[in-house]
């Protein structure tokens, strides 16, 4: 059976610095399949997060997506039609994504309103998604403000809000950053479970090759905004083809006193 695929095609994003045009994402194409996790890796500043922002039309001021499109099974979608309905997002710093003066219930209701999915009795929808995200004491959590919650709880709540959209694809930008190792593992296990149970397709932006090894099916490597290598995860770790990929894998292995075979 053919899996539904989200394809980023020929994406280019540029900015102007000191009167000179600078390319931040350079004619990038890649595909994310439902039921699989594609890790987007590279050094800091390689264009990982910018790729997601450009694909979803949420670029910072001064940056323009000058070319490219996003399709699902060959059908092109405008960025505003993708966001929420077809692609949900979770961010690397969940604390900054929540309004500090509003409760988790407020955030859930606002999410449903923005998606046009608010029913007369939304409680069941909210509870179901929170439990799917591993949050059990739902009544208490819904009454909390962001400052009353740990980073791990906020990340799970962000995942729950993403699940409210029922989108088939998820862009996860550094979802384990600033979390301790135990919480990191729980978040990774949760994402893996959601892929299996909900057939989610995930584009996982990360600099952590340990996360890649644990979670990804496939890996795309960026360097200065260009896609330089894409392969199944085992091939990336065992036989990386590009020098930049070799450097990333070697640096990861050196943390454990290991070396990449020549």
From Swiss-Prot:
Compartment(s) where it occurs, according to its Swiss-Prot or TrEMBL record: Cell inner membrane
Domain of life: Bacteria
SMART domains: AAA
Pfam families from the UniProt entry: ABC_tran
Predominant location: membrane
Top-rank EC class of the record's enzyme: translocase
Catalytic activity as recorded in UniProt: Ni(2+)(out) + ATP + H2O = Ni(2+)(in) + ADP + phosphate + H(+)
Positions in coiled-coil regions: none
Keyword annotations: ATP-binding, Cell inner membrane, Cell membrane, Ion transport, Membrane, Nickel, Nickel transport, Nucleotide-binding, Translocase, Transport
Entry GO MF terms: ABC-type nickel transporter activity; ATP binding; ATP hydrolysis activity; nickel cation binding
Binding site for ATP: 42-49
Topological category with respect to the lipid bilayer: Peripheral membrane protein
Keyword field contains Translocase: yes
Annotated Gene Ontology cellular component terms: plasma membrane
EC number: 7.2.2.11
The ABC transporter domain, residue ranges: 6-249
Gene3D superfamilies membership: P-loop containing nucleotide triphosphate hydrolases (3.40.50.300)
Protein task: Part of the ABC transporter complex NikABCDE involved in nickel import. Responsible for energy coupling to the transport system.
Record note on quaternary structure: The complex is composed of two ATP-binding proteins (NikD and NikE), two transmembrane proteins (NikB and NikC) and a solute-binding protein (NikA).
Family under the similarity heading: Belongs to the ABC transporter superfamily. Nickel importer (TC 3.A.1.5.3) family.
PANTHER family: ATPASE AAA-TYPE CORE DOMAIN-CONTAINING PROTEIN, OLIGOPEPTIDE TRANSPORT ATP-BINDING PROTEIN APPD
Record's protein name: Nickel import ATP-binding protein NikD
Gene name per UniProt: nikD
């Amino acid at each position: 059976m053919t899996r539904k695929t989200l394809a980023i095609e020929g994406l280019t994003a540029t900015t102007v610095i000191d009167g000179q045009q600078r390319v931040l994402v350079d004619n990038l194409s890649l595909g994310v399949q439902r039921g699989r996790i594609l890790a987007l890796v590279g050094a800091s500043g390689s264009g990982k997060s910018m790729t997601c922002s450009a694909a979803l039309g949420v670029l910072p001021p001064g940056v323009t997506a000058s070319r490219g499109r996003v399709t699902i099974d060959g059908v092109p979608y405008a960025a505003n039609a993708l966001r929420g309905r077809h692609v949900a997002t979770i961010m690397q710093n969940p604390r900054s994504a929540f309004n500090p003066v509003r409760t988790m219930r407020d955030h859930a209701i606002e999410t449903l309103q923005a998606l046009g999915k608010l029913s007369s009795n939304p409680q069941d929808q909210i509870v179901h998604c929170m439990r799917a995200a591993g949050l059990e004491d739902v009544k208490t959590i819904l009454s909390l403000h962001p400052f009353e919650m740990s980073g791990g709880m906020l990340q799970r709540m962000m995942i729950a809000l993403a699940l409210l959209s029922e989108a088939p694809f998820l862009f996860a930008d550094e979802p384990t950053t600033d979390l301790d190792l135990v919480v990191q593992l729980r978040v990774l296990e949760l994402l893996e479970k959601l892929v299996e149970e909900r057939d989610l397709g995930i584009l996982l932006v990360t600099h952590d090759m340990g996360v890649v090894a644990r979670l990804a099916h496939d890996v795309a490597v960026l360097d200065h905004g260009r896609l330089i290598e894409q392969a199944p995860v085992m091939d990336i770790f065992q036989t990386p083809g590009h020098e930049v990929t070799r450097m990333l894998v070697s640096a990861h292995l050196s943390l454990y006193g290991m070396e990449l075979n020549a």
